[in-house]
């Protein structure tokens, strides 16, 4: 068994990087430690221009770069020096004048940055596929018993610290090896994804008219946390995150206190946070089992998130027990005190948490308190995945939203300004409610939420029952439906409950009947032309 603690000294290093962040300082430190440096192309020039002694690979191999730099390091003196097994291949290395290379610092051509540039064509993309780099990375990673491979600039400092202590341990080299294979796997996956979208039916292969979906789907996530169990205790689980999340979310949040997040905590917190991000004014979202059970926007600037919380909680005090609470403003002491003194809560998440609020929540040591940072108004395009037996459904993320200018009034009566504000509020909430979804709202507070029913009219009935149970009046409220009404009974029920305005996508074969039902009841109705199914 390999000794995990024995340190491997470094006498010779090969440095060839596209991203030169920190490389000059790294090379200087290696030189100060007596390490001989081999280098190539632009990296060699950078070192030479800054007084760092280095040997150009072409001088070492006796073989000049050729084919516009396509062939630089693909040489036995390079790969023999990397792959050579110490104590086994020494004689053959000596016979062929191959010197051992103990450390390889390489990162790859910026393929991702290249293909993301406007106007990038296929030949340009192809020229930015690195060949020599991944080959060296894989060689060094394979022979990690004798060679250290460094692909991340963030590891330079740790490597130098270890070298000053006598060398890198096997445990460190193993970790660097794993990072290297993860790096090349992500790189090759990115290339396969891109090439898999090229229009092969065109007379000339081009990236014009590219498919959104590659022939094989390659995506890499990094394990952030192993969990005690999954959705249920008999299931195992872990939480994986993107290497570069495109926007603030549960994956970027910092846990300030509390028990370890569970599988269900992560899923529910994501639902709550994504919903509250829909609102500009101070808002609160309370979620239970991935469904909003209470949502509110503070009706006045002075009320802040404390008032939003009070209104959201009032929607469904029973379901709020053991729920997830999300805010779109800093959690302040007053709001934190109101929460911990009133209810049992699993998770509280906000862009930031004041020191006073943090001290208050600390009295409830098990409460998971998260700060996620501020987010921009624009939602990032991304992919959503759903596992099915033997396959994976992939779709673009639902970031569609509408404003008042997008509403199509289809009834005789147009909604008032207040009704429009409430309709858009209810529509934003309905987007995050499991289908079939019905939301009653008034003054930008949810009055009743009907979720997950097989029949839309039953969701409407349940939302009304929930409102009555909470002591809230559906009369005078508005109603949002995540999809069209297939029959007029949905509108008839809305009229019976006292709803004054309705927002829905439209598009049913019976739209005319539904509109007639609204007109008969004097209900204002608008179509969005956009559906928000959520399964």
UniProtKB/Swiss-Prot annotation:
Catalytic activity, as annotated: (6R)-10-formyltetrahydrofolate + 5-amino-1-(5-phospho-beta-D-ribosyl)imidazole-4-carboxamide = 5-formamido-1-(5-phospho-D-ribosyl)imidazole-4-carboxamide + (6S)-5,6,7,8-tetrahydrofolate; IMP + H2O = 5-formamido-1-(5-phospho-D-ribosyl)imidazole-4-carboxamide
Domain of life: Bacteria
Classification via Pfam families: AICARFT_IMPCHas, MGS
EC number: 2.1.2.3, 3.5.4.10
Tagged with keyword Transferase: yes
GO cellular component: cytosol
GO biological process: 'de novo' IMP biosynthetic process
Keywords, ordered alphabetically: Hydrolase, Multifunctional enzyme, Purine biosynthesis, Transferase
Domain MGS-like: 6-151
Gene Ontology molecular function terms on file: IMP cyclohydrolase activity; phosphoribosylaminoimidazolecarboxamide formyltransferase activity
InterPro entries linked to this entry: AICAR_Tfase_dup_dom_sf, Cytidine_deaminase-like, MGS-like_dom, MGS-like_dom_sf, PurH-like
Pathway listed: Purine metabolism; IMP biosynthesis via de novo pathway; 5-formamido-1-(5-phospho-D-ribosyl)imidazole-4-carboxamide from 5-amino-1-(5-phospho-D-ribosyl)imidazole-4-carboxamide (10-formyl THF route): step 1/1; Purine metabolism; IMP biosynthesis via de novo pathway; IMP from 5-formamido-1-(5-phospho-D-ribosyl)imidazole-4-carboxamide: step 1/1
Keyword Transferase: yes
Family in the record: Belongs to the PurH family.
Domain notes from UniProt: The IMP cyclohydrolase activity resides in the N-terminal region.
HAMAP family recorded: PurH
Protein name: Bifunctional purine biosynthesis protein PurH
Protein's organism: Pseudomonas fluorescens (strain SBW25)
Taxonomic lineage: Bacteria, Pseudomonadati, Pseudomonadota, Gammaproteobacteria, Pseudomonadales
Gene (name only): purH
């Amino acid at each position: 068994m390999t000794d995990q603690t024995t340190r491997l000294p470094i006498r010779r290093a090969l440095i060839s990087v596209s991203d030169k962040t920190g490389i000059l300082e790294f090379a200087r430190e290696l030189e100060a430690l007596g390490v001989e440096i081999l280098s190539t192309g632009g990296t060699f020039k950078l070192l030479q221009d800054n007084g760092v002694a280095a040997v150009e690979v072409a001088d070492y191999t006796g073989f000049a770069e050729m084919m516009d730099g396509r062939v630089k390091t693909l040489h036995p003196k390079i790969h023999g020096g990397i792959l050579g097994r110490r104590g086994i291949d020494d004689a053959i290395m000596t016979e062929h004048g191959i010197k051992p290379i103990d450390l390889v610092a390489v990162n790859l051509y910026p393929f991702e940055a290249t293909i993301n540039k406007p106007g990038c064509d296929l030949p340009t993309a192809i020229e930015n596929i690195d060949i020599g780099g991944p080959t060296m990375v894989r060689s060094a990673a394979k022979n990690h018993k004798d060679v250290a491979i460094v692909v991340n600039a963030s590891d330079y400092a740790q490597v130098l610290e270890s070298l000053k202590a006598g060398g890198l341990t096997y445990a460190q080299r193993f970790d660097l090896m794993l990072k290297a294979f993860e790096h090349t796997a992500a790189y090759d996956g990115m290339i396969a994804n891109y090439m898999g979208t090229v229009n092969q039916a065109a007379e000339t292969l081009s990236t014009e008219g590219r498919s959104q979906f590659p022939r094989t789907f390659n995506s890499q996530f990094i394990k952030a946390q192993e969990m005690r169990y999954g959705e249920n205790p008999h299931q195992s689980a872990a939480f994986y995150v993107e290497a570069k999340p495109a926007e603030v979310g549960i994956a970027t949040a910092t846990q300030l206190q509390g028990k370890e997040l569970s599988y269900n905590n992560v899923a529910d917190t994501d639902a709550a946070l994504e919903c509250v991000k829909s609102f500009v004014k101070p808002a609160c979202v309370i979620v239970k089992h991935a469904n909003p059970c209470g949502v509110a926007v503070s009706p006045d600037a002075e009320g802040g998130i404390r008032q939003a919380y009070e209104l959201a909680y009032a929607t469904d005090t029973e379901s709020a027990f053991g729920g997830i609470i999300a805010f779109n403003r800093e959690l302040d002491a007053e709001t934190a005190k109101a929460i911990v003194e009133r209810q049992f809560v699993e998770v509280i998440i906000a862009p930031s948490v004041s020191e006073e609020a943090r001290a208050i929540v600390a009295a409830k040591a098990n409460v998971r308190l998260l700060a996620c940072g501020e987010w921009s108004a624009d939602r990032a395009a991304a992919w959503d995945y759903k596992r099915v037996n033997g396959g994976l459904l992939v779709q673009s993320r639902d970031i569609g939203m509408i404003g008042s200018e997008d509403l199509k009034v289809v009834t005789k009566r147009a909604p008032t300004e207040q009704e429009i504000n409430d309709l858009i509020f209810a529509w934003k909430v309905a987007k995050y409610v499991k289908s079939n979804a019905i939301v009653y709202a008034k003054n930008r507070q949810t009055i009743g939420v009907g979720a997950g029913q097989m029949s839309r009219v039953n969701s409407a009935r349940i939302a009304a029952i929930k409102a009555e149970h909470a002591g809230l009046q559906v009369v005078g409220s508005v109603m949002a439906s995540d999809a069209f009404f297939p029959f007029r009974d949905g509108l008839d029920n809305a009229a019976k409950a006292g709803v004054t305005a309705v927002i829905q996508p439209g598009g049913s074969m019976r739209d005319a009947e539904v509109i007639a039902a609204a007109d008969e009841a004097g209900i204002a109705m608008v179509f969005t032309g956009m559906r928000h199914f959520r399964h």
